[in-house]
A protein has these predicted regions:
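Membrane-interface segments of envelope glycosyltransferases acting on lipid-linked substrates or membrane lipids
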Residues: 1-112
């Protein structure tokens, strides 16, 4: 399995911590575990395992085509099969899926 967690930032918070924990735990059990931060890095970056592939997109607007294309290339280069966006990062995952329709999305909503 080749899976990437997608989260808006690595500031300290519940969804952010869960994304880091998932990426770290999966890195011990599967072929490829990645973590992509779309908008901001933060204090949780230091907790990412060196076994996790990390990408910071530096996305600065809702529809940042450059960031989407960088994520698409990252997914292609790493043969990613699953995207697991957390909360509002779902939109980013859907845009990547338009370019890479074989990728499956597992949405993790933290609102309820």
């Amino acid at each position: 399995m080749r899976i990437v967690q997608i989260i808006d930032s690595l500031e300290i918070g519940g969804a952010e911590k869960m994304a880091v924990n998932y990426a770290n735990s999966l890195a011990e059990k599967i072929v490829f575990s990645g973590l992509v931060t779309t908008r901001r890095e933060g204090n949780l970056k230091s907790q990412i395992s060196n076994k996790v592939s990390y990408l910071f997109l530096e996305r600065n607007k809702t529809l940042d085509l450059g960031a989407i294309l960088r994520l698409r290339e990252y997914c292609k280069d790493n043969k990613v099969e699953y995207l697991q966006p957390h909360s509002s990062s779902y939109f980013t995952a859907v845009l990547v899926k338009i370019f890479l329709p074989k990728i499956k999305i597992i949405w993790h909503d933290h609102m309820d």
